[in-house]
C-alpha cells in the first residue's frame, strides 16, 4: 500500500530525524576548516567550540568551507563575529548532512549551505542575528 502524497514528506522528515538521533553519539563539532574570505580561528573547550571570524577586506562577511558541520546534543558551537551586521557564510564540502542537535549561536548572521542536507533536531537550538 502506498503512502498518500501528503504523508511522504512527513515520513521522510521522520526518517531523517531518526537517523540523526541514532547517529547523535557519533556526530562531532564542525571540522576541516578552510578560510576563503576574511579570517577565522577555532578554539575548543570541552563540549564548546568557538569560531572567531573577521570580515574580508572591504566586505561585511567571511566565507568558510567545512569538511563537516554538525552540533552534537549537549554541545555549543558559537560564532563570534565583528558585529551583528556581519555574516559568516559556511559551506560544507563533505558528503555528510549537517545535524544541529545542540546549540548553535552567533552575534551576527549565519549562512549554512550543505548539499547533503541540514536538520535541526528536537533539542537543537539556533540563536543568531539571522540564519
Please state what every model-predicted region is:
Residues 2-12, 16-131:
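Solvent-exposed adhesion/ligand-recognition segments of exported proteins
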Amino acid at each position: 500500500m502506498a503512502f498518500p502524497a501528503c504523508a511522504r514528506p512527513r515520513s521522510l522528515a521522520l526518517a531523517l530525524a531518526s537517523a540523526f538521533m541514532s547517529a547523535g553519539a557519533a556526530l562531532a563539532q564542525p571540522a576541516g576548516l578552510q578560510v576563503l574570505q576574511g579570517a577565522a580561528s577555532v578554539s575548543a573547550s570541552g563540549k564548546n567550540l568557538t569560531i572567531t571570524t573577521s570580515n574580508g577586506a572591504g566586505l561585511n562577511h567571511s566565507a568558510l568551507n567545512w569538511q563537516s558541520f554538525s552540533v552534537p546534543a549537549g554541545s555549543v558551537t558559537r560564532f563570534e563575529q565583528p558585529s551583528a551586521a556581519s555574516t559568516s557564510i559556511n559551506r560544507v564540502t563533505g558528503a555528510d548532512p549537517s545535524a544541529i542537535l545542540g546549540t548553535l549561536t552567533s552575534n551576527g548572521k549565519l549562512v549554512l549551505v550543505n548539499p547533503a542536507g541540514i536538520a535541526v533536531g528536537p533539542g537543537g537550538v539556533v540563536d543568531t542575528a539571522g540564519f
